[in-house]
Amino acid sequence: VSRLNDLIRQVGRKDEVLASDLQREVAALADRRSFGLNFERHVPEAVELPGRPVRRGDKVRILPPRGQARTAADERLWRVTRTSAGEAEVEVAPLDDDSDDARTTVTREDLVVVAEFRDPIYPGLVSTGTVERGGDKPFHTVINAENYHALQALLFTHRGKVDAIYIDPPYNSGARDWKYNNDYVEGDDLYRHSKWLAMMERRLLLAKELLNPDDSVLIVTIDEKEYLRLGLLLEQVLPDAKIQMISTVINPTGAVRGSSFARSDEYIFIASYGVTGAPRVSRSWSKDGHATSSAAPAEPYWRNLRRSGSNSLRSDRPNLYYALRVDPSTGRVSTDGPGDEVLPIRPDGKDGYWQVSAAALPSLLGAGFVRSRRHRGEWIIQYLATGEQAKVAAGDFVEEGREENGALVLRGVTADLTVATTQWATPSHSARHHGAVLLKALIGDRSFPFPKSLYAVEDVLRFFVADKPEATILDFFAGSGTTAHAAMRLNRQDGGRRRSISVTNNEVSADEQRTLRDGGYRPDDPDWEALGICEYVTKPRITAAITGRTPKGDLVTGDYKFTDEFQMADGLEENVEFFTLTYEAPLQVASHRAFERIAPLLWLRAGARGGRIDDVSDGWDVAETYGVLADLDGAGPFVEAVAGAPGLQLAFIVTDEDRLFEAVVRELPDHVEPVRLYESYLRTFELSTGGSTR
């Protein structure tokens, strides 16, 4: 190796870029393990960024004429050497030949920017829509992005703060199901395992930085094609984690593959930090799919007495709109007693209706099946529905007394719980019945290959976030959005405020790409992007789950099954915002000219709840959970506003001066975390580009 280093130094005197590339390759070879998992991790990985504006210094590819397929020559990398605002053409030079003779002029529309994963990026976010039915709950987030770059962005917002990561990466089947360096990885590619491992390692190294090091879990599903290599990779990337593997039946009838055994299961790797207590389920779980995946006893589910979801307006059931009374001293609910008046008003301010008639309510009150709770100054009325009442009658819940408001105090019985095994075979995990069929009910005939069972994802997450009602859950291979959907269902079951972050690209299937290309379309054309997975599947599925309506506006047909059974048309009381990742110029960021795209990252770092500060043209602003000081002349009123906001956690201060930053920090309340902009932002992305991307 020393002789190679001498030769590289000689090369560097003539070509520094070539010498740097050679040094990186030699370092990768020298870093190989004597034992363990060795693979070609030094193979460079790059991604095209359609729609990203072309700037001087960018790496680009020249696109073939519209309607023509790409050839090997089109994969050549070029660098933009000259560009002017308003000009349709730019000058480019081959990355491997910077001579004047090699330079050429190309129209902007025939170029696509390329980012190699060893290059620093400076991400922002642009909102592409919201669905709000969750009142003051935190927002779930869906990000349309290359997931490696999205993970880098999340280092700024969520480093060490994620409670659970669930991913279902490509299985590397050879069936054109994933790309490396913009090309599908075929089954006969001799390096397909190395490419898959290199792709996974880069992302797992970033994911490790996002997990809470004291108490968190990484869950990865995989099949037989890569499970052996994935297990070794997890041991190398996460040496301090406790790692187990579960075999779970997802296709009870089995998939016949030639002369092989019919394949009926896949594998779940669970890598956990600080998790204590054995995960438990009901003894009947494998038979009926009703999960109680918690070491704690099952608790009764108190539903909101006000109807939610579709058909929840007063006009739908006018006879169920009536006033209740709550005694403020005891919380006792009645239809005609003293106290505060409570009406079934929806989160959007419109009149709704109760789920029980005025005539039937007194019997539920007498049985202790109705209770009141105070939340943010308002009364919420809850009740036990028929299914929960039956569990009380069957002895699944033991009465320990009554609250002052007359409601039963119930304790779950733990006698039927047992430690979950590493072999799962429950009807609720069928990928066809509770993945594909359920997805079709939500979004119709929009196709998506191999969606997970909603209840399978829900069950495995429940083991680790049942006792974390405000958990942050990340899925950076989000696909159709099953993980976000599962997190929302968990919230409904226990009144939680968990938030999910779903990352998916907007890749179009291989067949659709061919058809679109033959029609003269390119990536970033509206007709092309409309068929991408994020726009065509993920966003519509999550929207349908919340609203209870399909993309066509029809009510979703069918019912949710197992642990929490209700009509899918009811929807879910949740909030979600959809974003697309942008690529910013560092000088624009540093000079405060990209704040509109950086603003969503600040909001995410503050918990994705409450209002977002998108404009600080007045010098400063304060929202529920964070504040931004852009002009230090306003430091006095800013500090006063921060001190008067009890829920505020973060203060972002825009300054290049250490002394001025420290002066503002000294005036802030002790519980408020100060963050300096844009130093903290820029430094995050300069440091996140390193060994993991070689």
What is each PLM-predicted segment?
Residues H149, Y171, E226, A478, ...:
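Short, glycine/acidic-enriched loop or turn micro-motifs at the edges of active sites
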Residues I443-Y455:
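Conserved SAM-binding loop and adjacent beta-strand
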Residues A175-Y191, D511:
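Aromatic- and acidic-residue-enriched carbohydrate-binding clefts of CAZyme catalytic domains
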